[in-house]
From Swiss-Prot:
<dbReference type="InterPro" id="IPR008280">
    <property type="entry name" value="Tub_FtsZ_C"/>
</dbReference>
<dbReference type="GO" id="GO:0005874">
    <property type="term" value="C:microtubule"/>
</dbReference>
<keyword id="KW-0206">Cytoskeleton</keyword>
<dbReference type="GO" id="GO:0005737">
    <property type="term" value="C:cytoplasm"/>
</dbReference>
<protein>
    <recommendedName>
        <fullName>Tubulin alpha-5 chain</fullName>
        <ecNumber>3.6.5.-</ecNumber>
    </recommendedName>
</protein>
<feature type="binding site">
    <location>
        <position position="71"/>
    </location>
    <ligand>
        <name>Mg(2+)</name>
    </ligand>
</feature>
<dbReference type="InterPro" id="IPR000217">
    <property type="entry name" value="Tubulin"/>
</dbReference>
<dbReference type="InterPro" id="IPR002452">
    <property type="entry name" value="Alpha_tubulin"/>
</dbReference>
<dbReference type="GO" id="GO:0046872">
    <property type="term" value="F:metal ion binding"/>
</dbReference>
<feature type="binding site">
    <location>
        <position position="71"/>
    </location>
    <ligand>
        <name>GTP</name>
    </ligand>
</feature>
<dbReference type="InterPro" id="IPR013838">
    <property type="entry name" value="Beta-tubulin_BS"/>
</dbReference>
<comment type="subunit">
    <text>Dimer of alpha and beta chains. A typical microtubule is a hollow water-filled tube with an outer diameter of 25 nm and an inner diameter of 15 nM. Alpha-beta heterodimers associate head-to-tail to form protofilaments running lengthwise along the microtubule wall with the beta-tubulin subunit facing the microtubule plus end conferring a structural polarity. Microtubules usually have 13 protofilaments but different protofilament numbers can be found in some organisms and specialized cells.</text>
</comment>
<feature type="binding site">
    <location>
        <position position="11"/>
    </location>
    <ligand>
        <name>GTP</name>
    </ligand>
</feature>
<dbReference type="InterPro" id="IPR017975">
    <property type="entry name" value="Tubulin_CS"/>
</dbReference>
<dbReference type="InterPro" id="IPR036525">
    <property type="entry name" value="Tubulin/FtsZ_GTPase_sf"/>
</dbReference>
<feature type="site" description="Involved in polymerization">
    <location>
        <position position="450"/>
    </location>
</feature>
<comment type="function">
    <text>Tubulin is the major constituent of microtubules, a cylinder consisting of laterally associated linear protofilaments composed of alpha- and beta-tubulin heterodimers. Microtubules grow by the addition of GTP-tubulin dimers to the microtubule end, where a stabilizing cap forms. Below the cap, tubulin dimers are in GDP-bound state, owing to GTPase activity of alpha-tubulin.</text>
</comment>
Amino acid sequence: MREIISIHIGQAGIQVGNACWELYCLEHGIEHDGTMPSDSSVGVAHDAFNTFFSETGSGKHVPRAIFVDLEPTVIDEVRTGSYRQLFHPEQLISGKEDAANNFARGHYTVGKEIVDLCLDRVRKLADNCTGLQGFLVFNAVGGGTGSGLGSLLLERLSVDYGKKSKLGFTIYPSPQVSTAVVEPYNSVLSTHSLLEHTDVAVLLDNEAIYDICRRSLDIERPTYTNLNRLISQIISSLTTSLRFDGAINVDVTEFQTNLVPYPRIHFMLSSYAPVISAEKAYHEQLSVPEITNAVFEPSSMMAKCDPRHGKYMACCLMYRGDVVPKDVNAAVATIKTKRTVQFVDWCPTGFKCGINYQPPSVVPGGDLAKVQRAVCMISNNTAVAEVFSRIDHKFDLMYAKRAFVHWYVGEGMEEGEFSEAREDLAALEKDYEEVGAEGADDEGDEGDDY
């Protein structure tokens, strides 16, 4: 069995987690208390959904997940929420004082006290697996817990489970909307360890998702619940092939193999289609070519950067629902002829497609319409560097004056770590620039950097 353990860190990670598990439960017909009326074989572990749920002797299905936060309020909402009986109390780990938007607190002082407990819980989940495939890590890098404790956990997971793949779903600070003044510091420090300790990281950005909700779903003032439900659709589409059987299944390690040309170039853009409200869906037919075109639209990217400014190195298209390979091939052929979608010249094929016959589910009373077919795209595009250069610029403005740095140093960090992380990101921007440069023959010395 190829199990996956999900780790939700900090407020953002936990709230995205709530949306994801709500959706998984719907898709598999699992009730709020973990029972699954349709599952007649109690205790038999070969069902596909067992990659994400473990089954107890009494026929209860428990998510293979842990939720960690340095302060209790967000986790208390899970403890008292409608899915409180789904999780084992040991899976919900909360500390007493929060990281106060400070990477150093999350990584050194406060986080250090809780990280062993987390790893202990992860080990229990891992012992319960017959063939652990890897980890999905959910966090935001703007705050203190998601960035600090997030990177600490990733570093420790690399030590304990070196060969297992780690996929990150990481919420990056938005260009305009900011929830903390020190976001650029936390993001740069955290990305420094994401670079080394995740195999694939999918960048998400609230502002981009706000815009999608406003534009496509006609929600005037989107809430975090609206955003998270949209994010959960993407994550669900990515993991569909692990949880259901389909025509062309895609494994987690396959993402890595197909999307990551060089170890450091592993930050992905994601998009999903159709994002459409129930009123509109009634009048539209949404064929495979239509939704395929839609995921390549710059406006449907879940991070604020324009793929037309960069080149695609690879992309993964995950279709679900009423889709046959013939339609997919035709749609992909059309995309290849478009001038707006440019591939680097050293990667001519560039498409990996997966098809799953399980149609997309939607949360009842949610914003998305129930549709027959949907597609989720994860793409590796050199334009992602825009996200980093934006954050780097803000970092530089503050760091030039050493503003707010004393908060970090006071928690046991050294100033050198700032410049080290910043240099690492500068190198990353340069890597992206080189990868997108014309002509592959002058890049023979790529290998020395890693």
